[in-house]
């Protein structure tokens, strides 16, 4: 896709990928409602294919490509859930899926890529190394690059998540989503504002990876230098395409501490009895810190994924 998607294009994307993804449930918790003084609705993308919302964007990007575009397969660079999502999408399309991963990527995410038949190339844990390795694979195989977030087709697919939220809950006042590269937040903002112009959309990110916050404050996309956070899915800087939308349409960016992320993650596990990864806990962490006025409001929260290394949980002392 060459440009920013419309609501009708996001709806068409949902039709194309519907057979290959779950319409994930929306759960609530009376306990958390009482604690935060609001009606909270959790969109459980931790129950999605590959355990994360990334299945939506990767599947649409691969299935919407022409035969000529994917004749040599597809390639991406990712340390996280997009890697597994693209490997799975390539398998559905019947083409090779080349995945460049840093050698320090979480073990659980490496294993997920291999489970879906992805062809992994390891590299040093820098963006330059990842991009160079992906470019080499492109040159050698003719594979099409599917960027993890700075890709309009990926953004379009990610926007299908909030379609389901607002179809089921049209009277929401606010939606909270974590932000890393910005694909989910961008698709969410475009679709939500088109479906319900008065709704508020906030992006939440770790204070140790706060480029989105700084970018919105200055009006210029800021670099993500040396991110430090347990939310490994949010260590990437906001993409150019995402920022071109978000600086115009997003209601704000909230930063949260590592301690609040751990509290929110553990609270979700213990109270709701569901597994989420640190990145998925970041929106609830904003409520833990009381950084948003949600009193009496109906708030949608996107739980983005549930892929965790059970041997290295963030509340364990040796993490």
Model regions and ranges:
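PLP-dependent amino-acid enzyme catalytic core
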Residues: 1-319
């Amino acid at each position: 896709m060459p440009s920013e998607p419309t609501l009708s294009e996001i709806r068409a994307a949902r039709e194309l990928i519907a057979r290959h993804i779950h319409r994930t449930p929306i759960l609530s918790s009376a306990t958390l409602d009482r604690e935060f003084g609001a009606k909270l609705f959790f969109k459980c993308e931790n129950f999605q294919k590959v355990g994360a919302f990334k299945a939506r964007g990767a599947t649409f990007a691969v299935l919407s490509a022409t035969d000529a575009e994917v004749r040599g397969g597809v390639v991406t660079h990712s340390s996280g859930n997009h890697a597994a999502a693209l490997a799975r999408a390539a398998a559905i399309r019947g083409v090779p899926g080349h995945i460049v991963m840093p050698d320090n990527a979480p073990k659980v995410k490496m294993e997920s890529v291999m489970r879906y038949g992805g062809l992994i190339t390891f590299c040093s844990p820098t963006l330059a190394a990842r991009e160079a390795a992906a470019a080499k694979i492109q040159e050698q195989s003719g594979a099409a690059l599917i960027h993890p977030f700075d890709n309009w087709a990926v953004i379009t697919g990610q926007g299908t998540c909030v379609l389901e939220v607002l179809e089921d809950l049209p009277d929401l006042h606010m939606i909270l989503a974590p932000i890393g590269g910005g694909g989910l937040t961008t698709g969410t903002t475009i679709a939500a504002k088109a479906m319900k112009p008065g709704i508020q959309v906030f992006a939440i990110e770790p204070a140790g990876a706060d480029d989105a916050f700084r970018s919105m404050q200055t009006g210029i996309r800021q670099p993500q230098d040396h991110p430090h956070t347990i939310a490994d899915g949010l260590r990437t800087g906001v993409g150019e395409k995402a920022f071109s939308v978000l600086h115009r349409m997003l209601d704000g960016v909230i930063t949260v501490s590592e301690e609040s992320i751990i509290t929110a993650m553990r609270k979700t596990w213990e109270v709701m009895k569901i597994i989420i990864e640190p990145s998925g806990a970041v929106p609830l962490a904003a409520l833990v810190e009381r950084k948003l006025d949600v009193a009496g409001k109906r708030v949608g929260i996107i739980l983005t994924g549930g892929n965790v290394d059970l041997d290295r949980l963030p509340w364990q002392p040796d993490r």
